[in-house]
UniProtKB/Swiss-Prot annotation:
GO CC terms, sorted: cytoplasm
Keyword field contains Ion transport: no
Function: Reversibly transfers an adenylyl group from ATP to 4'-phosphopantetheine, yielding dephospho-CoA (dPCoA) and pyrophosphate.
Keywords: ATP-binding, Coenzyme A biosynthesis, Cytoplasm, Nucleotide-binding, Nucleotidyltransferase, Transferase
Protein name in UniProt: Phosphopantetheine adenylyltransferase
E.C. no: 2.7.7.3
Pathways per UniProt: Cofactor biosynthesis; coenzyme A biosynthesis
Gene coding for it: coaD
One example GO MF annotation: dephospho-CoA kinase activity
HAMAP family: PPAT_arch
An example Gene Ontology biological process: coenzyme A biosynthetic process
InterPro entries for this protein: Archaeal_FAD_synthase, Cyt_trans-like, PPAT_arch, Rossmann-like_a/b/a_fold
Source species: Pyrobaculum aerophilum (strain ATCC 51768 / DSM 7523 / JCM 9630 / CIP 104966 / NBRC 100827 / IM2)
């Protein structure tokens, strides 16, 4: 199958995997031949998360397992990122970036940084928000909060 882009990038913390992550990753596999996933380092995640995320090694293993289910035949590379941009600002091979509505401004910043470096901007694909049955936006933070509620811990 011929894909629209040879190299697609996306990034995130990928702490508690959920259907929003599946949508983000599946979108990347629908448009790109090779997928580069930037996974935040533990130290970088601690600068913006209000809770302690799972260790990098656990998040990476979970992400690899999920990608093997979504697109087992696809070439996927993983890179640990220590800032909001990762290799997206300097890798000239990258042609497209997939982002959520929440992270779309960061994708635009990345393209601005690429322009400053004389690189072509990437095409930006923004996925819509995924909501639970109550209309709440799904996120790892939201899921963690729900699971930590006292009523969630009752048998």
């Amino acid at each position: 199958m011929k894909y629209k882009f040879r190299n697609v990038v996306l990034g995130g913390t990928f702490d508690t995997l959920h259907s929003g992550h599946v949508k983000l990753l599946a979108t990347a596999t629908l448009i790109g031949d090779r997928i580069l996933i930037g996974l935040t380092s533990d130290s970088f995640a601690s600068t913006y998360k209000q809770y302690k995320v799972r260790p990098f090694s656990v998040r990476l293993a979970n992400l690899r397992n999920l990608m093997s289910l979504i697109a087992p035949e696809r070439e996927v590379a993983y890179v640990e990122i220590h800032d909001p941009y990762g290799p997206a600002v300097f890798d000239p091979r990258l042609e497209a970036i997939v982002a959520s509505i929440e992270t779309a401004p960061r994708a635009l910043q990345i393209n601005d940084e690429r322009a400053k470096r004389g690189l072509r901007p990437m095409e930006v694909f923004i996925i819509s928000t995924v909501r639970d049955g109550y209309g709440h936006t799904l996120s790892s933070t939201y899921i963690r909060r729900v699971l930590e509620r006292p009523e969630s811990k009752q048998s």
